[in-house]
């Protein structure tokens, strides 16, 4: 229907719940824009779309990258090599204010929305941990539980100046009654080893919130669906110039930057693809709205008859991936008891 200090080998450690391969699951992508500099209003907007998707039978709802907090396309933050300025500092202060703490009140509200509407929810958000920001995907269950998060491990280009880098401790794949759900954010999808880690954890519904609406992106999504033998859901914002806050110093490529002209700044392209490489819904480049498809879960087994990238088509005697899932912290504090135990073990 249209409209992931100790090193460990990659393995699927999720609890097996089991999915009926004969079942069909309806999933929905929300293609819409952030309300910039207004996180409460963005949450209100998200609620509207979640309610609408659930009313149409969706069991999983996916939002775009950085939907809460906003994807700062064209923002400069006063950045230039060897240059620092007050305007950039103020711009970052405002952006930081729009980000959310995880856990926090906004996360609680999202969990409540997922539970009230009986949906699995995957939400793109800008997370603040102290004064470092992360581009994060948040996962919620239909029982109203916050399951956990994935922090983008490698921001792209100038994103690295405003977002921190996630570590291997937040690369989850959740085993749910509708399938194993995980996420790769934007150009993480171009990292073969990251994708392989998700495949090894058994991902079946591969969520790809993104800020890339190029034609090449569509080709990547089809490739990943076929490579991983999984359903791929790619969510992108659709945003017009008028929806950005007033600012004299945005840099938008190939468009006339005036609110009167009101060009499209983020061009959509949300799409749903089957494990066999078939486009089930989208891409939508025209407007905000819902992109919905019914997933035949039996297609996963059908696809893996001939190609299982971490199973019968792998070659572990030659190629092997190791993933460090230990949290990386800049400072570790040891109590006197821990120090004594450490000394006694030497």
Swiss-Prot record:
Enzyme class: hydrolase
Modified residues annotated as N-acetylserine in this record: 2
Pfam entry (one): CN_hydrolase
E.C. code: 3.5.5.1
Reactions accelerated catalytically: a nitrile + 2 H2O = a carboxylate + NH4(+)
Membrane topology (UniProt): Peripheral membrane protein
InterPro entries: C-N_Hydrolase, C-N_Hydrolase_sf, Nitrilase/CN_hydratase_CS, Nitrilases_CHs
Hydrolase among keywords: yes
Subcellular localization(s) per the UniProt record: Cell membrane
List of catalytic residues: 65 (proton acceptor), 152 (proton donor), 186 (nucleophile)
Membrane in keyword set: yes
GO BP term (any one): cellular response to sulfate starvation
Domain spans labelled CN hydrolase: 25-297
Keywords: Acetylation, Cell membrane, Hydrolase, Membrane
Main location per the UniProt record: membrane
Gene Ontology molecular function: indole-3-acetonitrile nitrilase activity; indole-3-acetonitrile nitrile hydratase activity; mRNA binding; nitrilase activity
GO CC term, one of those recorded: cytosol
Family: Belongs to the carbon-nitrogen hydrolase superfamily. Nitrilase family.
PANTHER family, sorted: NITRILASE (PTHR46044), NITRILASE 1-RELATED (PTHR46044:SF11)
Protein task: Can convert indole-3-acetonitrile to the plant hormone indole-3-acetic acid.
Protein known as: Nitrilase 3
């Amino acid at each position: 229907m249209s409209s992931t200090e100790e090193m460990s080998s990659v393995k699927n450690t999720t609890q097996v719940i089991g999915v009926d391969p004969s079942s069909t699951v309806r999933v929905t992508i929300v293609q819409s824009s952030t309300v910039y500099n207004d996180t409460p209003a963005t949450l209100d907007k998200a609620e509207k779309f979640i309610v609408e998707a659930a009313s149409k039978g969706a069991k999983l709802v996916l939002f775009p990258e950085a939907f809460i907090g906003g994807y700062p396309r064209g923002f400069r933050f006063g950045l230039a090599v060897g240059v620092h300025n007050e305007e950039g500092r103020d711009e970052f202060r405002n952006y930081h204010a729009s980000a959310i703490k995880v856990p926090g009140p906004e996360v609680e509200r999202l969990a409540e929305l997922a539970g009230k509407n009986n949906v699995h929810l995957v939400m793109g958000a800008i997370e603040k941990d102290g004064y470092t920001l992360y581009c994060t995907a948040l996962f919620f269950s239909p029982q109203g539980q916050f399951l956990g998060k994935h922090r983008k491990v490698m921001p792209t280009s100038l994103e690295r100046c405003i977002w921190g880098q996630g570590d291997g401790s937040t690369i989850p794949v959740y085993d749910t009654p509708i399938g194993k759900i995980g996420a790769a954010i934007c150009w993480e999808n171009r990292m073969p080893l990251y994708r392989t880690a998700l495949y090894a954890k058994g991902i079946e519904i591969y969520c790809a919130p993104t800020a890339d609406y190029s034609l090449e992106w569509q080709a990547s999504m089809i490739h990943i669906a076929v490579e991983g033998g999984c359903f791929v859901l790619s969510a992108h914002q659709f945003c017009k110039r008028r929806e950005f806050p007033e600012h004299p110093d945005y840099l938008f490529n190939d468009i006339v930057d005036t609110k009167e002209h009101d060009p499209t700044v983020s061009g959509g392209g949300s799409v749903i693809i089957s494990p066999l490489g078939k486009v089930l819904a989208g891409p939508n480049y025209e407007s905000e709205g819902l992109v919905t498809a019914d997933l035949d879960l039996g297609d996963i087994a059908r696809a893996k008859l001939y190609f299982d990238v971490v199973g019968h088509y792998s070659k572990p005697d030659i190629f092997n991936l190791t993933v460090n899932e230990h949290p990386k912290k800049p400072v570790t504090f040891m109590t006197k008891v821990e120090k004594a135990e450490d000394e006694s073990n030497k």
